A protein has these predicted regions:
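A SIS-like phosphosugar-recognition module
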Residues: 1-209
Length: 209
């Protein structure tokens, strides 16, 4: 349904994995989760493609960055990990993906004026205020804080933020990754790199017995 995965950094694969998990959840819920909700996803993903110009502007801010901390919580945690992986693969940026809890437990000490943070949050749900508080806490250290998703207060707490989807929190990951993918593509291009063919990567990795 998604077509061949041509790019070495597998973006379609990630989204279709989310889809497979969602379909499984619908099947196991015995009617508790409706298919109608999933039908909201395609339009939300398409809407996120319009974020490309803003993603290019944010990429310009990050082009000279040497390291980056990416963090999310709840349903957005997987998005943060996937985004940090794509930044490493395609932009050769040593991005560290951490959950909110792991970050504030100790590694938060490395975030300063020379180490930006990229925070990812759904547009609603109980995690948004906590991510907003984290953005403010990091900004108080002088760290450049950038965001993806969240609400207006979250965006205001960040130096710059890319909008996220208007989806319930449990569906947000489908479209929340798209601004991150656009940012990754723009940052790789700004560095003169080919985001579809990173060095040292093959389509299939054999790890041996």
């Amino acid at each position: 349904m998604a077509g061949p995965e041509l790019s070495v950094p597998a973006t379609k694969t990630y989204t279709t994995q989310l889809g497979a998990m969602a379909v499984l959840a619908v099947a196991l819920s015995g009617g508790g989760i409706g298919v109608a909700e999933l039908q909201l996803v395609p339009a939300a993903v398409a809407e996120m493609l319009e974020v490309a110009p803003a993603a290019e502007a944010l990429a310009d801010r990050l082009v000279a960055v040497e390291t980056l901390v990416v963090s999310g919580r709840g349903y957005a945690y997987s998005t943060a990990l996937e985004l940090s992986l794509k930044l490493k693969e395609t932009c050769y940026l040593p991005a560290v993906g951490l959950s909110y809890a792991d970050l504030v437990h100790g590694p938060i000490a490395v975030v300063d004026a020379g180490t930006p943070a990229l925070l990812v949050a759904a547009g609603d749900g109980p995690m948004v205020p906590e991510m907003t508080g984290l953005a403010r806490r990091l900004a108080a250290t002088g760290a450049p804080v950038y965001g993806i998703g969240g609400d207006q207060e979250f965006a205001a707490a960040c130096r710059a933020a890319l909008p996220g989807p208007s989806l319930p929190e449990h569906l947000a990951p489908f479209a929340l990754i798209v601004p991150g993918q656009l940012l990754t593509e723009a940052l790789a291009s700004a560095k003169g790199l080919d985001p579809d063919a990173p060095r040292g990567l093959d389509k299939v990795t054999q790890t041996g017995a």
